[in-house]
Amino acid sequence: MSTNSVVAYLRSDGAIVSSYVHYDGYETGVGMTLLEHYNSDERALAVSVGGYYSSLSEDLNESLEKSVHTEEVEMFDSMTEFEEYLMENSHLEFGYLWTGGKWMVSSWSRIGVGAAWNGFSWLVTSFVREGRKTVERFRDRARDDNREGRTEYDEYADELEVTIDKWHRYGMGEIATEAMAA
């Protein structure tokens, strides 16, 4: 099973270039990798023109070399066209878009037997929110295992929490800066 995503870059002419990522498309997977390793205009463009990634790591060349397929990049003439593509392809559970010097993320929510398109929001806030839920799930899993000492779940939760706290501080700083400028 996989969590599919698209990584995209909004060009200055309004066109969008994007690549597909097959595994770990959720915020604490691909999202965290984008924040940690592709969080500049140059790196965001580089990751968006890869075409296809089985999974995305901090090393772009390694990610391409380890991919089981190769595909051309997807091009869209406008944001409207890109959003329509995401909405028509619900197997793409997450869409990441570099625009205005930051990553945005789109996703779906399950509603009954269907799904609702959530649109785009700032990746930092989504990563912090979903990351905290993930940490709690891992801590619950570690407790449920009833093992003595620390488990790999505890260790991953600790590592993830450090990254979440860093991005939480960054996000709060950005919000404060915007509020002061208003």
State the predicted function of each range.
Residues 4-9:
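Short beta-strand scaffold segments in enzyme catalytic cores
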Residues 10-15, 98-101:
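Short acidic-glycine loop/turn motifs at beta-strand connectors
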Residues 17-18, 105:
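A sequence-level detector of short linear motifs
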Residues 18-29, 111:
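Short, solvent-exposed aromatic-acidic interface loops
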Residues 30-36:
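Cysteine protease-like catalytic core of ubiquitin/ubiquitin-like
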Residues 37-182:
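Low-complexity intrinsically disordered segments
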